[in-house]
């Protein structure tokens, strides 16, 4: 109910059907509500079963370690780098089939000329991230939402990424909220970038126990290294009016 992997379920599954499981793949953090997953406990439960971790959303924002993992996925575009370049970190000695065949480059794992400019841009993007400052803005935004819209439901748990605030506003529709927010000069989303434009309730929010009405009236606010106190103040200022108009429209 808090966006965290059900460890008891996983433990029971591994105990009963471990011999059938080839790989356990888990997100380091949820991209819709920001919940951080207990990766170390997943690895412990997995035992000899390989564990892959998708840390795309967490890179730079919170500590990420490869300890105990078999594979780790990273991507440049989540840290200000270009789209289309990332990294797959693999345990030493792991034999994986080649994605592309040809000249045998990169020890026959990835043939073809590498996109050197994109790779260099990825490296350049891996600079420091102001986690403490962004976390402070996130907490202020959550507090502001609660005080300005008392019946709002905060879906982001306490243990979450610095820059994600996910909130449901019962009696509204996400598309209407987006339009009204855009008219106020505020950019936000009804979910993750991967699911934007998909007109159905978020499976993440439904798994949290939200009703369909609550799930469709949800916005995700993303804060980053360039977000300011003024941005948060402006959002909190216009939010009550936006919610009132959205409810009237519905």
Please report, for each region that a protein language model flagged, where it lies by residue.
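Pyridoxal 5′-phosphate
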Residues: 1-250
């Amino acid at each position: 109910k808090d966006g965290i992997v059900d460890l008891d379920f996983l433990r029971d599954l591994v105990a009963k059907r471990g011999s059938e499981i080839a790989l356990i793949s888990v997100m380091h953090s949820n991209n819709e509500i920001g919940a951080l997953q207990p990766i170390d406990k997943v690895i412990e439960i997995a035992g000899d079963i390989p564990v892959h971790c998708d840390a795309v959303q967490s890179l730079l924002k919170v500590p990420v370690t490869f300890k105990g993992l078999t594979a780790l996925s990273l991507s440049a575009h989540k840290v200000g780098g270009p789209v289309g370049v990332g990294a797959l970190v693999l345990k030493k000695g792991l034999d994986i089939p080649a994605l592309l065949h040809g000249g045998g480059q990169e020890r026959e794992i990835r043939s073809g000329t590498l996109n050197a400019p994109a790779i260099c841009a990825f490296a350049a993007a891996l600079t420091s991230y102001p986690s403490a400052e962004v976390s402070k803005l996130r907490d202020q935004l959550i507090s502001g939402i609660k005080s300005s819209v008392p019946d709002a439901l905060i879906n982001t748990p306490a243990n979450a990424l610095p820059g994600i605030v996910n909130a449901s506003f019962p009696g509204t529709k996400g598309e209407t909220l987006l339009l009204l927010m855009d008219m106020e000069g505020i950019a936000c989303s009804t979910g993750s970038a991967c699911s934007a434009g998909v007109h159905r309730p978020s499976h993440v929010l439904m798994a949290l126990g939200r009703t369909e009405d609550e799930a469709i009236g949800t916005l995700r606010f993303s804060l980053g290294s360039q977000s300011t106190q003024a941005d948060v103040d402006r959002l909190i200022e216009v939010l009550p009016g936006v919610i009132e108009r959205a409810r009237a429209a519905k």
